[in-house]
């Protein structure tokens, strides 16, 4: 490879990082500083985002998108297959680690849960525009449902019932945003302007607030106490999962913005939500927090290269 080719590639990656990732980390830095200097409680900010802003975002994106039922169905199928692949890869990788049950639950949880909300949605918008955001939102919705069903089942390791996990779906506000959007589209009845304007304002606030929550969560990270286990989980999440996602996206038939957004979302670092589940069910919370922090901090190296690939091959 010629030196000029290497220089061009480096310039491309730097340009992608500056335009698509640096804004996210700049806003996350603000959240980190707020949590570190004036003690803003992440739980309060997270709940405002989760219960008020995220449903408005999902509603606004879906009613203004051109997604049809087939496209949405393919994205949900893609998410299901990606999650299954992540689970199987994590289960195999855990064998030589000889983990106890709580540690195994934590290990599976961090590998199957990607940060498709706080991190994935803003990056999808910056890298692939409104079309990419629409598909990324479908992935985010599916992952939100999983967090309160499969995620809880994994974390609980049999201590909670299936019924309790299913009831948890009702606690996902984004579901109501999606249902309202579906009803509006089905009936061909858009919201009156007096209602749509506040929804749009809340929607516009969602992505910046999600990133601030991400930064506040990073401020709580501690030094890993199980480096081999942490390293294995991080490699699975941000190195091997992108490769698996590319293959699965082709198998499902995703194309264009759907392919870009789907692969990007599946390749995000570990979801912040896993720290909440780990604390709730006492499954290696320090390990989970370490994986969230390290995978997020290293993700610009992998996500930048991935975006360059997706922009050239979709």
Model regions: which residues?
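Alpha-helical transmembrane segments of multi-pass small-molecule/ion transporters
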Residues: 1-314
């Amino acid at each position: 490879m010629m030196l000029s080719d290497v220089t061009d590639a480096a310039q491309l990656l730097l340009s992608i990082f500056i335009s698509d990732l640096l804004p996210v980390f700049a806003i996350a830095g603000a959240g980190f500083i707020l949590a570190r200097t004036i003690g803003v409680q992440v739980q309060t900010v997270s709940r405002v985002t989760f219960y008020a802003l995220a449903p408005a975002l999902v509603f606004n994106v879906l009613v203004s998108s051109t997604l049809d039922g087939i496209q949405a169905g393919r994205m949900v199928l893609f998410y299901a297959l990606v999650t299954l692949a992540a689970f199987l890869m994590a289960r195999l990788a855990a064998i030589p680690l000889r983990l106890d049950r709580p540690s195994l639950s934590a290990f599976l949880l961090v590998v199957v849960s990607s940060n498709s909300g706080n991190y994935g949605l803003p990056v999808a918008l910056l890298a692939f525009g409104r079309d990419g955001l629409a598909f990324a939102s479908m992935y985010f919705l599916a992952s939100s449902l999983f967090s309160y069903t499969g995620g809880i089942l994994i974390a609980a390791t049999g201590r909670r019932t299936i019924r309790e996990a299913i009831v948890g779906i009702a606690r996902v506000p984004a579901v109501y945003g999606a249902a309202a959007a579906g009803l509006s589209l089905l009936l061909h009845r858009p919201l009156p302007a007096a209602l749509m304007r506040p929804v749009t304002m809340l929607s516009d606030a969602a992505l910046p607030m999600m990133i601030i929550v991400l930064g506040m969560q990073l401020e709580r990270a501690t030094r890993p106490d199980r480096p081999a286990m942490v390293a294995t989980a991080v490699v699975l999440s941000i190195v091997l999962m992108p490769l698996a996602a590319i293959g699965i996206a082709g198998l499902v038939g995703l194309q264009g913005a759907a392919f870009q957004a789907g692969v990007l979302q599946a390749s995000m670092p570990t979801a912040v939500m896993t720290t909440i589940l780990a604390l709730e069910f006492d499954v290696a919370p320090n390990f989970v927090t370490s994986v969230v922090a390290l995978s997020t901090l290293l993700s610009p190296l992998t996500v930048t290269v991935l975006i360059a690939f997706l922009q050239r091959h979709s």
